[in-house]
């Protein structure tokens, strides 16, 4: 029987079980790294560094996890904070690397041309809309969970997702075959 995230967190808290935390990392590292790659506009090295920071912070601060939300929501919040702190330091000067976009493998988008256009369109969205769209549409968080991760009101998340999706549709339609 596979342990739940809550069971693993309990083992970390009670027994300081590093193997349990390792299992939490294994379960969530792909999603966290994927989110950070999108937020950093496909800068793989930076995203991986930020993911490592996020997991380290999660381990150091796991006693602050209150269980009010899923562990993954709490972890996404930490990862997003790492991104925001880094973006503030860099003033978000990260550009688009075309080769990395082409190597990006999104299982939902099999057409390389469409994947490229989608990545390009996502990178053109304002950060608040891009973050909400990525969390809700790509990472499968509910609007409520995304609001917790982004630390913004639920209505703002819904608005950002709606606006972001509408902008993506318009951009992709404009770039499509005529």
Go through each PLM region and give its residues:
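Arg/Lys-rich amphipathic alpha helix in sigma70-family domain 2
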Residues: 60-67, 77-97, 163
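Short helix-capping/turn signature of helix-turn-helix
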Residues: 27-30, 38-40, 134-141, 151
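Internal acidic/polar
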Residues: 2-7, 85, 91-115, 120
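Sigma70-family region 2
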Residues: 13-14, 38-42, 52-70, 89-91, ...
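N-terminal module of bacterial RNA polymerase sigma factors
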Residues: 1-26, 30-31, 170, 177
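Short, small-hydrophobic-rich alpha-helical interface motif
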Residues: 12, 32, 36, 47-58, ...
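Short, charged helix-capping/linker segments at alpha-helix termini
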Residues: 13-23, 34-53, 176-178
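DNA-recognition helix of helix-turn-helix
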Residues: 84, 129, 138, 144, ...
């Amino acid at each position: 029987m596979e342990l739940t995230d809550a069971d693993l967190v309990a083992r970390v808290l009670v027994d300081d079980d590093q193997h349990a935390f390792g299992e939490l990392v294994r379960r969530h590292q792909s999603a966290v790294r994927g989110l950070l790659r999108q937020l950093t506009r496909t800068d793989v090295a930076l995203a991986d560094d930020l993911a490592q920071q996020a997991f380290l912070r999660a381990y150091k601060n796991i006693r602050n996890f209150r269980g009010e939300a899923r562990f993954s929501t709490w972890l996404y919040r930490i990862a997003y904070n790492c991104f925001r702190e880094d973006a503030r330091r860099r003033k978000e000067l990260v550009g688009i690397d075309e080769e990395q976009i082409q190597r990006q493998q999104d299982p939902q988008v099999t057409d390389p041309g469409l994947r490229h256009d989608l990545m390009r369109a996502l990178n053109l969205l304002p950060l608040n809309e891009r973050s909400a769209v990525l969390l809700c549409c790509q990472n499968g968080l509910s609007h409520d969970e995304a609001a917790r991760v982004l630390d913004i009101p639920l209505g703002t998340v819904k608005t950002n997702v709606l606006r972001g999706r509408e902008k993506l549709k318009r951009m992709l339609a404009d770039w499509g075959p005529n």
